[in-house]
């Protein structure tokens, strides 16, 4: 089965049409932060990540007035994850109060079910496109110039709410 349906088991996220991520700001003045220094021995890690993200269509070049810094975070397997510090942008973002389901909400609904499934959404945030008017505020500083996200990045204050809403739409009627 895995071989027959290989195309659905991929490391490359595909975009959903269920929703887009919109960023609503409390001010018009763009957020501009200074770049954080990247240690020389990690520049190749960042460069490869940028190449991969450009090739997958996750990011694109930007000429926006916004600029957030990159942070390389060491993972438990000693590799690095490239993250964007959206802290200043998050401060001026209108909060989305989308309710998150808790285990106490979910487990009673599972009682008495005949079949159970799990989902592992490959890079799930990257499956959600950014609304066109919100792309510029995701811009971040690289040695190659500014880049911005075409899809929803991690680290934005309302990303979890948008993702939760998308999963809810995806699973509607499956109970």
Region spans (language model):
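Retroelement reverse transcriptase polymerase core
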Residues: 1-175
